């Protein structure tokens, strides 16, 4: 992460326990392997940095059923259960919450091998009574007589008090019972997440973030929270994906998008004034390069831009065209390769960063495509210049 985009890391003072969002899957795998012999992980990070999404994706890929407790929204009864009088024994019994993995033995034995993952989200924003109930879950793996399944994996996430989310500082009792990871936002992490078909990002957003990752011209969370006015939108991973990307998908063409007088305002409304203005300018300059269809037809000889950021804009415009057919895809891939200077191109049949971006985007956007390799082979066969 460049110095221009590292303001968020100052919140962690470059602590030794600081990791990237890209590291979350590996961290979860290590804790899952150790299971009950290891303290549960607590993932602390800026809001909108894809903590929950990363956990959900890991759970789905590793055979876990995710039970999410959004703790700020819950009362004590939601965790402890609701009291039901046992008149014969003259005691109060608590009926367990059906949304939590309470039960005897192993969950996997009766659920086709699937294991339960109890995700305690927004732990640091929970009320004190709920926080204390959650602490018993973490410490004793039970609340009263209600016991978690033996194979339950507990994971928690939240924000720190410095992040201006209304979070509370951890108590020593919680800090002593959890493995705490401070997670910094990662462009590469969100790009990898957005490349999945279920999380498909708009090509312009992906290209802009790719350009930032390659050139260091900004990144995620460029607004310092210490200077934030409390009113302007923030350029988080959530803002780019669920805000800006979803908004851009409403346009039918680049011309329609740039012809909208409110386009810059819409961009700023989703990711903040600074990031939104830069994004709108990135799109405008990329489109001004020329007619992308003419460039594709003359892929081997047309002029290409020299500005690294604008090159990513051209690559973004290739995505929708490349998915038309394999012949067009081959030409787009030739053009994508030419965006990388000859001296920096890999030898043989290895892809450049632009070719990799284009191929992944096309495979993600085109469900008719069988595999990445089918497109790759077709492209290699369509033009001998691919290896030059």
Feature locations, PLM:
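C-terminal regulatory/interaction module of P-loop NTP-utilizing enzymes
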Residues: 2-388
């Amino acid at each position: 992460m460049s110095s221009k985009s590292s303001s968020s890391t100052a919140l962690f003072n470059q602590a030794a326990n600081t990791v990237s969002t890209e590291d979350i899957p590996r961290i979860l795998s290590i804790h899952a392997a150790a299971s009950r012999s290891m303290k549960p992980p607590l993932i602390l990070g800026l809001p909108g940095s894809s903590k929950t999404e990363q956990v959900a994706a890991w759970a789905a890929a590793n055979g876990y059923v995710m039970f999410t407790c959004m703790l700020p929204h819950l009362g004590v009864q939601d965790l402890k259960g609701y009291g039901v009088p046992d008149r014969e024994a003259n005691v109060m019994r608590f009926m367990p919450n059906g949304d939590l993995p309470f039960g005897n033995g192993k969950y996997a034995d009766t659920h086709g091998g699937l294991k339960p993952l109890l995700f305690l989200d927004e732990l640091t924003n929970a009320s004190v009574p709920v926080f204390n109930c959650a602490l018993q879950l973490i410490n004793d793996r039970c609340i009263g007589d209600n016991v978690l399944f033996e194979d339950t994996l507990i994971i928690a996430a939240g924000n720190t008090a410095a992040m201006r989310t209304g979070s509370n500082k951890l108590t020593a009792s919680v800090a002593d019972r959890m493995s705490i990871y401070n997670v910094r936002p990662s462009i590469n992490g969100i790009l990898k997440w957005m490349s999945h078909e279920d999380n498909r990002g708009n090509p312009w957003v992906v290209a802009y973030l790719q350009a930032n990752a390659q050139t260091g011209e900004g990144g995620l969370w460029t607004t310092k929270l210490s200077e934030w006015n409390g009113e302007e939108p923030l350029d988080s991973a959530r803002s780019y994906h669920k805000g800006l990307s979803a908004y851009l998908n409403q346009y039918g063409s680049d011309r329609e998008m740039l012809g909208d007088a409110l386009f810059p305002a819409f961009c700023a409304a989703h990711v903040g004034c600074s990031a939104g203005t830069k994004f709108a300018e990135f799109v405008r300059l990329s489109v001004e390069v020329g007619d992308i269809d003419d460039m594709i037809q003359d892929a081997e000889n047309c002029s290409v831009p020299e500005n690294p950021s604008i090159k990513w804009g051209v690559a973004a415009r290739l995505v929708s065209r490349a998915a038309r057919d394999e012949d067009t895809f081959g030409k787009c891939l030739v053009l994508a390769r030419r965006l990388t200077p000859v001296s920096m191109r890999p030898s043989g049949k290895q892809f450049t960063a632009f070719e990799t971006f284009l191929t992944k985007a096309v495979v993600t956007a085109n469900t008719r495509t069988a595999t990445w390799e089918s497109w790759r082979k077709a492209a290699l066969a369509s033009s001998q210049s691919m290896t030059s």
